Amino acid sequence: MKKVHLGVIIAGAAVGLAALILTALGNPTNMGFCIACFLRDISGAVGLHSAAKVQYVRPEIIGLVLGAFIMSVASKEFKARAGSSPAIRFVLGAFVVIGALAFLGCPLRMVLRLGGGDLNALVGLIGFTGGILLGIASLKKGFSLKRSYEAHKAEGGVLPTVMAALLILVVTVPALFKFSEEGPGSMRAPFWIALVIALVVGALAQKSRLCMVGGLRDAFMLKDFHLLYSFVAIFVVTLVGNLAMGKFHLGFALQPIAHSAHLWNLLGMVLVGWGSVLLGGCPLRQLILAAQGNGDSAVTVFGMLVGAALAHNFGLAGNPDSKSEAGELIVGGISTAGKIAVVLGLVVMLVVVILNLPKKEEAKA
């Protein structure tokens, strides 16, 4: 087995194991890691939205960024670059998270949900794959957000600095932040344990180029499957772990923090897949790229934070399945505003692609 394959398998297995440990220690079920959900919690903690059930400074996000930053500096892979259509990336990042919160999970949580038996995530995977195929079609037509340029090191260090400052503030002045007393935001692993686990995962993700989108994109586009091994490793480890702990529950209805409104699970993840290909990586990959000096990815992460806040300020996020007092299933889903936002996001993706295709003169050249 090639060394690169072994590296991505180890990284994927570590992510799966870390997710199981974090869930066992208090994180929500099938949500050991979720980039979209955890960014949403942070946006609530700093006051960008007022949804009381989803507010917490998630140490997992801080750890992922700082772990990747430390690894990139240690391996001399930290390179400050920026200038590749930052405003467009901000908007795309916002819509990617809106799509993820319609589904109730980023691509990483989608895999974790599959490993827990949640078949709604299979619907999400179909949509995610469809979105990636749309992204590949866009790339083959010549779509590009143009090149980035070498930048000052201070530019590349923006997100690691923000995360380090956030860590210092939450430890020394926790009263500055809002913390959920019920709901998903109140379900959390011990802070320092979660931080240390995330530091390790961030370092491994940086070194292995771990990306939930990259595996499927490269498999379809280049017949290169090595990144896909990490995707499979995460699934296998979480599946085996959940089976061993009696946490595997196969089905659609009443899955943890999930809904069975299939159309919107599918379309939400189409939006995530398409947007992630256009951006050059999934939400996890954007965190890692920003940590190793990519200013454009940092802008994307800030867009994701704003998108998460918008999703809860305007009621765009999905609502989980529930039971009535009579014990009948109440299928969750998204509001009319959420449906409009997902469709609008798909339209925005299309417009961005069209406006960033090569002009006839460029194509001839």
Residue ranges and their predicted role:
Residues M1-A365:
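Membrane-interfacial helix-loop segments of redox and metal-homeostasis proteins
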